[in-house]
Amino acid sequence: MSYSLKGLLKRPVHLFVKPPAVEGEYPARGELYYVKGSNGSGKSTVPSYLAENDPQAYVVTYNGKIMLTVCPSYNIICIGKYDKSKSKGVDSLKDTEQMLFALSIADQPEYLKYDVLFEGIIPSTLLSSWIPRLTRPPRELVVLFMDTPLETCVSRVKSRNGGADFNESLVVEKWERVHDHSQRHKGLFPTVPAGMMKSNGLTIEQAVFAFLNRDFGSID
């Protein structure tokens, strides 16, 4: 499918009742964050919070499809949509081509003043193919691995399913794969900065605060 930047539209996230103005300033760092984690790890928690709490938030659409969620109060662009639907982030986009198109929108001059947050279960489980795709100067690529324990991930997925049976082995396999990626990252990609995105033991507000202050843990 052929995509064109001419077909883009903007729409406010908060049409009727807006959240209060965001207190404080959160300058961009010139970075693109590639967040990796299994189901239930909390990958979408921070971007969902930003979209819900930024009164200036808006989405960029193409043919009715949400490509970007822009949070000006936090100087962050989140790839994909962050609403009440089940699929969030790049998982809400159709395929790799659409993900790359969304990234190309974020590369446009009007958006370069923002940092970018890219997360989804499919890119999380791939070891290397997204590293070159997300190396997009002038932004610096930073890979972030969720620090959420396996037991917590499994518990969250079970809760989402209302306690119904699910294939726990799929969550375990994805968690182990992402954990393996974190252990191998420095050896495979020594020039690509990486860290741990803090979630374990934190409230949602604490996790968001840690991210906004770029307080990342070490992968060592």
Swiss-Prot record:
This is 5-hmdU DNA kinase 1. Belongs to the thymidylate kinase family. 5-hmdU DNA kinase subfamily. Keywords: Host-virus interaction, Inhibition of host innate immune response by virus, Restriction-modification system evasion by virus, Viral immunoevasion. The lineage of its organism: Viruses, Duplodnaviria, Heunggongvirae, Uroviricota, Caudoviricetes. Gene3D superfamilies: P-loop containing nucleotide triphosphate hydrolases. InterPro entries: HMUDK/HMUD1, P-loop_NTPase. It catalyses: 5-hydroxymethyl-dUMP in DNA + ATP = 5-phosphomethyl-dUMP in DNA + ADP + H(+). GO terms for biological process: symbiont-mediated evasion of host restriction-modification system; symbiont-mediated suppression of host innate immune response. It comes from Salmonella phage ViI. Pfam families: HMUDK_HMUD1 (PF18748). Phosphorylates 5-hydroxymethyluracil (5hmdU) into 5-phosphomethyl-2'-deoxyuridine (5- PmdU) on DNA as a step in the pathway leading to thymidine hypermodifications in the viral genome. The phosphate is added internally to the DNA polymer. As a final result of the pathway of hypermodification, 5-aminoethoxy-2'-deoxymethyluridine (5-NeOmdU) substitutes for about 40% of the thymidines in the viral DNA. These modifications probably prevent degradation of viral genome by the host restriction-modification antiviral defense system.
